């Protein structure tokens, strides 16, 4: 007969009418009983023949995440001009006196941050924007391009101009100025011309000598023709990269080209569309180099669009436009939905490319990307704005993956010990926190994003792609991309972006100038940065408790008025360092702080309400007697595990689920086990912070146990010898139930760790409930007053130790040893400090 829930509760000693604990509890360690209960609850039956369930409520398997929804109305968020002050260490020292070694080291790590991957895999430009929304491909393309453009304008990205140069906006850092070769001078169009090939008059180029002269500028190599001068076409030409020098005289004009996006790595810049430092002659030469068909390593020829020259065309007809977009102006409409109609809406479509305010030399950077991008909702509560997702997961995968540095994450007990107090709280919102931290330009070639331009993107998405064929580019090829969908999309986007449609239809390659969110190193760097800043703030304002985790910064003070005055001073200090705060998102919490998914008050810590609701929904949807895919179980355990420390039986209650995940088998919930878990999560108990003097001690041997409660001594024996850790755990449970003490001295490290997941399942669950809210303090065996009773000797009474229990805060301690501060720095605010009143340093 299956085990009923009531019977199971009695067995686990969760009901009051259980027998004496000394008799009942050791039985739960019995292996035979644990096996029988597991069979009754269907916990051990992992091999099932029924099909697995792959979805429970919102939880799906690990590899089938929910499909993001595209919002055509997405707004691109605006980014302030973020420029973290380079002399941040000096500024902090002026404010607070000498910095600690720790603070200095952390701040030096991010000024500038460096990134050294073992191996970088370069992907074709086609993979730059991920085709996440096939229904809205064009819309997604332009919105993503606009987002990237916004980031570049805000100084967060570099734009690759040539293989070895990039431009950027915003204030340069000293390590960038060392690498500059002068600013772009926009008037001198021969060197740094802002006009790109679209707007070049045909007059200059039509008289340029072509033919033998072109050959003379290029030297033959085994890779085909190579330029002798730097910026003509650095990098390897493809297998068919020879230049067709036999050009009819009438074609001596500049033809445009969209550089090929897939294929061999040739380190051309955005090819002819970016202005290289070339003379008119070399521009002509390069235009022929570009228009020749190149064979790509992926096996198909990449067709580059250009206008077939007609001998009848006279010089007086004006310039031939080289841009894919502008070529439509001179062509006849192919249908009602031809792009010619859109291109003719405007006379001036602006330049093909934009240049940044500053130019910089960079390590050799190929015309490729190293990660894809796509857009999603900014967060579940804000669907009007978009967020750019950058996938640099190549650095975290495979045999060449980078081992990212570990950093301290405060656990629940540490957080409670630090923040559970009667302080008044507020949290600061750092806007675009990741984009505060500058990256060294040497990291740019590893962190590239971009796009191959609209024609290639559209061609790649249409399955019947006629753009990529093995013939020469003709006028017909130009119109191959015309379609009703594209026409309608572009017409709608024209209202939003206007003449920028032209700019965004060109290819672009961008490298990160500030740390990207998708890089594995970024969380570590952000954690170092904010923790160092908070450490400085705590010493500048000794009456304020400042604490941070990633970009979440909280301030605590004794009263609301005090908190407000601190808030003003600290905000000004952070702004002086170049840290951007979002004043609209400052949250005032009163005495209950919401932080990292917890509510923390003077009474202790509990999970936030939205997590409790999620758990209730999860149980409502949880099927009984149906095998659930172990990947879904991982999701369920993730949610339940977060709140496990607040339940009666804690983590041990979830052990059967952990076991099934480890063995990669499906898990079947029996009605009793589900009811047991439901009841566990119905009543959550706060985790609290305590300090006390230890008066109760427990010890055990495999055959017996002993307690010292004040001046009383007790002992008992086990029916059968037990493993030493199990015996020590039982002794601790007896000490708690006999004395009611919240603080117990023990010499066993496993009991001390309070992780009872390795014990027999039933015992682990029961012990977790009995020892809830109990704290342990380590006492060496030789000094343990309970040592003699556990060995059966009651006559000898060792003196009780005066052991004060101080809550630990793990590696997230607040107390930096403060160097001596010069006397001329006045106290900021004269209030009793919470660190001295409400706090005893751990």
From Swiss-Prot:
The keyword Heme does not apply. Pfam families: DNA_pol_viral_C, DNA_pol_viral_N, RVT_1. Hepadnaviral virions contain probably just one P protein molecule per particle. Terminal protein domain (TP) is hepadnavirus-specific. Spacer domain is highly variable and separates the TP and RT domains. Polymerase/reverse-transcriptase domain (RT) and ribonuclease H domain (RH) are similar to retrovirus reverse transcriptase/RNase H. The polymerase/reverse transcriptase (RT) and ribonuclease H (RH) domains are structured in five subdomains: finger, palm, thumb, connection and RNase H. Within the palm subdomain, the 'primer grip' region is thought to be involved in the positioning of the primer terminus for accommodating the incoming nucleotide. The RH domain stabilizes the association of RT with primer-template. InterPro entries: DNA/RNA_pol_sf, DNApol_viral_C, DNApol_viral_N, HBV_DPOL, Rev_trsase/Diguanyl_cyclase, RT_dom, Viral_Replic_Matur_Polypro. The record marks 63 as: Priming of reverse-transcription by covalently linking the first nucleotide of the (-)DNA. Residues 178-346 are annotated as: Spacer. One of its GO terms (molecular function) is metal ion binding. Belongs to the hepadnaviridae P protein family. Residues 357-600 form the Reverse transcriptase domain. It catalyses: DNA(n) + a 2'-deoxyribonucleoside 5'-triphosphate = DNA(n+1) + diphosphate; Endonucleolytic cleavage to 5'-phosphomonoester. PROSITE patterns: RT_POL (PS50878). One of its GO terms (biological process) is DNA replication. Residues 218-274 are annotated as: Disordered. It comes from the Viruses. Mg(2+) binds at residues 429, 551-552. This is Protein P. PANTHER family: PEPTIDASE A2 DOMAIN-CONTAINING PROTEIN-RELATED, POL PROTEIN. Residues 347-690 are annotated as: Polymerase/reverse transcriptase domain (RT). The gene is P. The lineage of its organism: Viruses, Riboviria, Pararnavirae, Artverviricota, Revtraviricetes. The keyword Nuclease applies. Residues 1-177 are annotated as: Terminal protein domain (TP). Keywords: DNA replication, DNA-binding, DNA-directed DNA polymerase, Endonuclease, Host-virus interaction, Hydrolase, Inhibition of host innate immune response by virus, Inhibition of host RLR pathway by virus, Magnesium, Metal-binding, Multifunctional enzyme, Nuclease, Nucleotidyltransferase, RNA-directed DNA polymerase, Transferase, Viral immunoevasion. Activated by host HSP70 and HSP40 in vitro to be able to bind the epsilon loop of the pgRNA. Because deletion of the RNase H region renders the protein partly chaperone-independent, the chaperones may be needed indirectly to relieve occlusion of the RNA-binding site by this domain. Inhibited by several reverse-transcriptase inhibitors: Lamivudine, Adefovir and Entecavir.
């Amino acid at each position: 007969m299956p085990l009923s829930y009531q019977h199971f509760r009695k067995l686990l000693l969760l009901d009051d009418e259980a027998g004496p604990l000394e008799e009942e509890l050791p039985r739960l360690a019995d292996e035979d009983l644990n096996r029988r209960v597991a069979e009754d609850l269907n916990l051990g039956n992992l091999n099932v023949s029924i099909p697995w369930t792959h979805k429970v409520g919102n939880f799906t398997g690990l590899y089938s995440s929910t499909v993001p929804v595209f919002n055509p109305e997405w707004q691109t968020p605006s980014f302030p001009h973020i420029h973290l002050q380079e002399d941040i260490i000096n500024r902090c020292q002026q404010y607070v006196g000498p910095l600690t070694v720790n603070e200095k080291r952390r701040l030096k790590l991010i000024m500038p941050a460096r990134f050294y991957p073992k191996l970088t895999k370069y992907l074709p430009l086609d993979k730059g924007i991920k085709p996440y929304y096939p229904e809205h491909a064009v819309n997604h393309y332009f919105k993503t391009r606009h987002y990237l453009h916004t980031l570049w304008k805000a100084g967060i990205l570099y734009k690759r101009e040539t293989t070895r140069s990039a431009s950027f906006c915003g204030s340069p850092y000293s390590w960038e100025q060392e690498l500059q070769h002068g600013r772009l001078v926009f008037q001198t169009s021969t060197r740094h011309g802002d006009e790109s090939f679209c707007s070049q008059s045909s007059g200059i180029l039509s008289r340029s000598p072509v033919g033998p002269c072109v050959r003379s500028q290029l030297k033959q190599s085994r890779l085909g023709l190579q330029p002798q001068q730097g910026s003509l076409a650095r990098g390897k030409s493809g297998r068919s990269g020879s230049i067709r020098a036999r050009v009819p005289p009438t074609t001596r004009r500049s033809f445009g080209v969209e550089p090929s996006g897939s294929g061999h790595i040739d380190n051309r810049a955005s090819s002819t569309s970016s202005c290289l430092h070339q003379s008119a002659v070399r521009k002509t030469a390069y235009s022929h180099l570009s228009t020749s068909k190149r064979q790509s390593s992926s096996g198909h020829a990449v067709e580059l669009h250009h206008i077939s020259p007609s001998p009848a065309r006279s010089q007086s007809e004006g310039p031939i436009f080289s841009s894919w977009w502008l070529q439509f102006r001179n062509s006849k409409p192919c249908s009602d939905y031809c792009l010619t109609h859109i291109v003719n809406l405007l006379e001036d479509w602006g330049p093909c490319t934009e240049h940044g305010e500053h130019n910089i030399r960079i390590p050799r950077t190929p015309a490729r990307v190293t990660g894809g991008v796509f857009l999603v909702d900014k967060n579940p509560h804000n669907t009007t704005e978009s967020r750019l997702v950058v996938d640099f997961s190549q650095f975290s995968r495979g045999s060449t993956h980078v081992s990212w540095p570990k950093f301290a994450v405060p656990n629940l007990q540490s957080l409670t010990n630090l923040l559970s107090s009667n302080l008044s709280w507020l949290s600061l919102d750092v806007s675009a926190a990741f984009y505060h931290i500058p990256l060294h330009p040497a990291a740019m070639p590893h962190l590239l994003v971009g796009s191959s331009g609209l024609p290639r993107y559209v061609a790649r998405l249409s399955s019947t792609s006629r753009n990529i064929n093995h013939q020469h580019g003709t006028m017909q090829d130009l119109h191959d991309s015309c379609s009703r969908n594209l026409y309608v999309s572009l017409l709608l986007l024209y209202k939003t972006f206007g003449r920028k449609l032209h700019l965004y239809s060109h290819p672009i390659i961008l490298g990160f100038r500030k740390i990207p969110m998708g890089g594995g190193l970024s969380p570590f760097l952000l954690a170092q940065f904010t923790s160092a800043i908070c450490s400085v703030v705590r010493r500048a304002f000794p009456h304020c408790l400042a604490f941070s985790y990633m970009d979440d910064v909280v301030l605590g003070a004794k009263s609301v008025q005090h908190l407000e005055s601190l808030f003003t001073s600290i905000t000004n200090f952070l702004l002086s360092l170049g840290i951007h705060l979002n004043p609209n998102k400052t949250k005032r919490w009163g005495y209950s702080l919401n932080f990292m998914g917890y509510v923390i008050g003077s009474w202790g810590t509990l999970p936030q309400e939205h997590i409790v609701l999620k758990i209730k929904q999860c149980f409502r949807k949880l099927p009984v007697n149906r095998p659930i895919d172990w990947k879904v179980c991982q999701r369920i355990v993730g949610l339940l595990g977060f709140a496990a420390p607040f339940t009666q039986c804690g983590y041990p209650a979830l052990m059967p689920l952990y076991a099934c995940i480890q063995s990669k088998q499906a898990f079947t919930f029996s009605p009793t086990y589900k009811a047991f878990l439901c009841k566990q999560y119905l009543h959550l108990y706060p985790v609290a912070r305590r300090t006390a003097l230890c008066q109760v001690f427990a010890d055990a041997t495999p055959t017996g146990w002993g307690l010292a409660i004040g001046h009383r001594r007790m002992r008992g024996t086990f029916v059968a010898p037990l493993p030493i850790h199990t015996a020590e755990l039982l002794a601790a449970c007896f000490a708690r139930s006999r004395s009611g003490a919240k603080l117990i001295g023990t010499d066993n490290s496993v009991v001390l760790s309070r992780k009872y997941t390795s014990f027999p399942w039933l015992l682990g669950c029961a012990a977790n409930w009995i020892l809830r809210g109990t704290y342990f303090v380590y006492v060496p065996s030789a000094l343990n007053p309970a040592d003699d009773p556990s060995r059966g000797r009651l006559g000898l009474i060792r003196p009780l130790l005066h052991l004060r229990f101080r809550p630990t805060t793990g590696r997230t301690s607040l107390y930096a040893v403060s160097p001596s501060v010069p006397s001329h720095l006045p106290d900021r605010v004269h209030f009793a400090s919470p660190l001295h009143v409400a706090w005893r340093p751990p």
